[in-house]
Amino acid sequence: MNGAGEINASRHRKENELKTCQILGAPVQSGASQPGCLMGPDAFRTAGLTQVLTELGWAVTDLGDATPTVEPELSHPNSAVKNLDALVGWTRSLSQKALEMARSCDLPVFLGGDHSMSAGTVSGVAQRTAELGKEQFVLWLDAHTDLHTLHTTASGNLHGTPVAYYTGQSGFEGLPPLAAPVNPRNVSMMGIRSVDPEERRRVAEIGVQVADMRVLDEQGVVRPLEAFLDRVSKVSGRLHVSLDVDFLDPAIAPAVGTTVPGGATFREAHLIMEMLHDSGLVTSLDLAELNPFLDERGRTARLITDLASSLFGRRVFDRVTTAF
């Protein structure tokens, strides 16, 4: 074969290679106030997530479920803090797994599990981003900012702390040191509608970008999301999306222990996922806080699976592009 033929053959192989996705269950429930999140990964599997992504043209590998490292029992001066040793074990394990997955596939997906899982998943993918010499960005779709530290949490439920941890805030003694903290100004939150005073102060202090539900009511989801995606694109950054079930209105997604009225609608959520797909910027994904014990015949698991499929390329409606 001549040189031109070899180049064309190589290009043809690359064009026909499937994008790779690895799925990892993170059956974490030690950070939540109610039991049940440990069943989340299997509920997503039962809802057909792997099959849907395969049908969309992805080469999907399910790695099973992660397990936490075994840690000594830990106490903290804040007596409200619960299950600190479990948080350390899960963070250490998931961070290493996330790093390995980000090195070996195009788009890792982490199935929760309560949102404390993101202390590990985000810190792991951020380490890979640093290896590549790029900037890590995070889109946090949630009713809560999750910006407490071990010292400020009043409930002691550690699913309220991951953003403060992975952005390198102080107050996490005993947790694994961060190899690559995420710049808090690279974190964009949408759907926020329940914030404690200490978290409100920290948002202003560190520069996290917040589009709460009032902003979404007044501007819609398009303007704030487009502005954020433009920032990511301009620096060729890598984008981690973390979707908490309570981002959605509990009327359509009841399977979460932290319901807050007034969440995102089905249409708003699908539009966000379609915009993310169109951007081509997403490099990793969390699906967090699914509690099947609180679900209605798998309704929420199916909805989140449907949203994930939109992010991976399935559309609610096929759109015709018109040239003007």
Curated annotation (Swiss-Prot):
Q: Tell me one Pfam family matched here.
A: Arginase
What does the record give under GO molecular function? arginase activity; manganese ion binding
Q: Which Gene3D superfamilies match?
A: Ureohydrolase domain
Cofactor info, note text:
Binds 2 manganese ions per subunit.
Residues holding Mn(2+) 2: 142, 144, 244, 246
Coiled-coil stretches are: none
Q: Which PROSITE patterns match?
A: ARGINASE_1, ARGINASE_2
> Per its record, how is this protein called by name?
Arginase
What is the primary gene name for this protein?
Answer: arcA
